[in-house]
Design a protein with these regions (language model features):
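N-terminal catalytic cores of NTP/NDP-binding nucleotidyl/phosphoryl-transfer enzymes
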Residues: 5-14, 18-80
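Active-site neighborhoods of enzyme catalytic cores
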Residues: 4-15, 71-139
Length: 139
């Protein structure tokens, strides 16, 4: 499906395989299961699966189910069905929530090493630091 000269990403992947930077290609599709997929998701699915398959690799489905108040099994099932409908099968199906404990432990370790910190900014302060389309953020 992909043209030989279709994009720079494929060129980079090819070079990294040829130069031994990586020995295989494994991509992922990481949706948050809080709504049905849209055309942008379909494009991402096609890109990831086609690139990995072109190089003999695979694609994992990693469901970013880290906001349980907005997510549901209905959306998980719909996402898996949509991927199949597009003609693809993920190598594995993983859930972000499966790694909560490990993520927490690593965050604590980074904080203890002085490599991370707990942010105590309010929502408004954080928005001011980020800026927006017409206002630059601040340091």
């Amino acid at each position: 499906m992909m043209n030989e000269n279709s994009n720079f990403i494929k060129t980079i992947m090819k070079n990294e395989l040829e130069n031994g930077v990586v020995d295989h290609i494994l991509t992922r599709f990481p949706p948050e299961p809080n709504a049905y997929l849209h055309i942008g998701h379909a494009r991402a699915i096609i890109n990831n699966f086609e690139l990995s398959e072109y190089f003999g690799g695979a694609t994992n489905l990693r469901l970013d189910d880290t906001n349980p108040s907005k997510e549901g099994a209905e959306y998980v099932e719909a996402i898996i069905n949509d991927i199949k409908w597009l003609g693809y099968t993920p190598k594995t199906v993983n859930y972000g929530s499966s790694y909560f404990e490990e993520t927490y432990e690593k965050a604590v370790l980074l904080i203890k090493k002085g490599l991370a910190f707990v942010c105590d900014l309010t929502h408004e302060e954080m928005a001011a630091y980020r800026g927006d389309v017409v206002t630059p953020g601040k340091n």
